[in-house]
């Protein structure tokens, strides 16, 4: 088992992402890879909707080190392959999306599905299975309301499951709300955040800076 150097928390607006969390239904503790804001330019003003933290299980460090050890933050930030490897790598990921402005479950889920479908069509992988998975995804969110400080939690398994949980106060619940078995959806949700057209460039920058530094620290301790 790899022993990680000291991992720090990240604050995004008023939201603090702790250095380590244990996802709902998991016996593993994940470390904070990076965090950032998701917003949109509306009438010349940048409106912030959510703060997003991306956590990884410890095995991610060993997996990423093979190709990215010794690379600078700028080198990994500019590489689409780096983020693709986080999305598709053989390790678990946990994403915490905390609302800054109120959002309905329908608003949030429809936008996520729109981004996922656009990604699948771009890579030629939109099948009936993905269509069915998005319908399940929309159903899970249908009656939810996320007030400021509430969180949407995703656990992405390399085996292909997407675990969805909700928290009204930003804490980590013990149990999940739903599990959807579809590898393409599991990966596409994270891809929509940190991928080529990801909705949170600041989370990508944070991941690049923190992980490149972490890989350097791990290299110096081995």
Curated annotation (Swiss-Prot):
Q: Which GO terms describe its molecular function?
A: chalcone isomerase activity
Swiss-Prot/TrEMBL site (Important for catalytic activity) positions = 108
Recorded E.C. number(s)? 5.5.1.6
Source species of the chain:
Verbena hybrida (Garden vervain)
What does the record give as its pathway?
Secondary metabolite biosynthesis; flavonoid biosynthesis
The record, for Gene3D superfamilies, names: 1.10.890.20, 3.50.70.10
Task: Write down the Pfam families for this protein, in alphabetical order.
Answer: Chalcone (PF02431)
- What is the top-level taxon of the source organism? Eukaryota
Function according to Swiss-Prot or TrEMBL: Catalyzes the intramolecular cyclization of bicyclic chalcones into tricyclic (S)-flavanones. Responsible for the isomerization of 4,2',4',6'-tetrahydroxychalcone (also termed chalcone) into naringenin.
Q: What is this protein called?
A: Chalcone--flavanone isomerase
Catalysis performed (reactions): a chalcone = a flavanone
Sorted alphabetically, which PANTHER family does this protein's record hold?
Answer: CHALCONE--FLAVANONE ISOMERASE 1-RELATED, CHALCONE--FLAVONONE ISOMERASE 1-RELATED
- Does the keyword Isomerase belong to this entry? yes
Q: Where does substrate bind?
A: 50, 115, 192
**Keywords attached to this entry:** Flavonoid biosynthesis, Isomerase
Q: Which family does it belong to?
A: Belongs to the chalcone isomerase family.
Q: What else is known?
A: Part of the biosynthetic pathway for all classes of flavonoids, a large class of secondary plant metabolites, many of which are brightly colored.
Q: Which InterPro entries match?
A: CFI, Chalcone_isomerase, Chalcone_isomerase_3-sand, Chalcone_isomerase_bundle_sf, Chalcone_isomerase_sf
GO biological process terms on file:
flavonoid biosynthetic process
The gene it comes from is: CHI
Q: Does the keyword ATP-binding apply?
A: no
């Amino acid at each position: 088992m790899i022993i990680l150097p000291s991992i720090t928390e990240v604050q995004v607006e008023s939201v603090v992402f702790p250095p380590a969390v244990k996802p709902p239904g998991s016996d593993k503790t994940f470390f904070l890879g990076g965090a950032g804001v998701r917003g949109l330019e509306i009438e010349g003003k940048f409106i912030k909707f959510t703060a997003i933290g991306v956590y990884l299980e410890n095995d991610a460090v060993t997996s990423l080190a093979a190709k990215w050890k010794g690379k600078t933050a700028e080198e990994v930030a500019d590489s689409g392959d780096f983020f693709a490897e986080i999305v598709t790598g053989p390790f678990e990921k946990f994403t915490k999306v905390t609302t800054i402005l109120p959002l309905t479950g329908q608003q949030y889920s429809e936008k996520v599905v729109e981004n996922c479908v656009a990604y699948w069509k771009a890579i030629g992988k939109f099948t009936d299975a993905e269509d069915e998975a998005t319908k399940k995804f929309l159903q899970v969110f249908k009656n939810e309301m996320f007030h400021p400080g509430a969180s949407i939690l995703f656990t992405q398994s390399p085996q292909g499951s997407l675990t969805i949980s909700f928290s009204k106060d930003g804490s980590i619940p013990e149990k999940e709300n739903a599990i959807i078995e579809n590898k393409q959806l599991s990966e596409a949700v994270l891809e929509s955040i940190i991928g080529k057209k990801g909705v949170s460039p600041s989370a990508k920058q944070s991941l690049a800076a923190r992980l490149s530094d972490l890989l350097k620290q791990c290299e110096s301790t081995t």
